[in-house]
Amino acid sequence: SEFFADGRGNRQPIAGTVPLGYAMPMHKDVDGSTGESPSPYKQVKFSSGVSYFDTGRFDNQWGTGIPVNEVTPEFIARGQERYAISCQVCHGDTGAGNGIAGKYGLVAIANLHQSRIRDMADGEIFNTITHGKNTMMGYGDRIQVQDRWAIVAYVRTLQAAKASSK
């Protein structure tokens, strides 16, 4: 390009720049502290931002990892509670796809222990909870962002329990 003296068509990013959608979220908590991932109990958030926390994606790739400082037993318990409210009716107690809804004619309820789902990145599971897939409706407007991640953590716990029982 003739616009810049060095012939480039654009400028290089400033050192330390993180591309949009690549940074793990580190939100300010409601009490004003920084550097902590959001608490699932203190914030209400249904938003659709562009960070990994909101989308499960880094640019055009599904991300792996739960975007909290630590996946604690309390966080997994929160996921279990939210799973029981929103997911269990179809996916069943253990995630095998044998919930009560299947007994009333709903077909193709996913077994969360299938290899195709076990092999999904955490971000893809988060996206499925958010937007739905096939016959599953999306829950992005019904389940807070933090709680969707807690459900992903709980689903991973169910999968690990099933794998260890083999």
How does the language model describe each region?
Residues 1-71, 143-152:
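Periplasmic c-type cytochrome electron-transfer domains
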Residues 29-47, 84-92, 111-119:
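Phosphate-binding glycine-rich loops and adjacent basic patches that engage nucleotide phosphates
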Residues 69-73, 81, 103-105, 109, ...:
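Bimodal feature
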Residues 73-96, 130-131, 151:
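Sequence/structural segment immediately N-terminal to covalent heme-attachment motifs in c-type
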Residues 84-108, 135-138, 142, 157-166:
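Periplasmic/extracellular electron-transfer cofactor-ligation site
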Residues 106-158:
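Extracytoplasmic electron-transfer domains, predominantly the class I c-type cytochrome c fold
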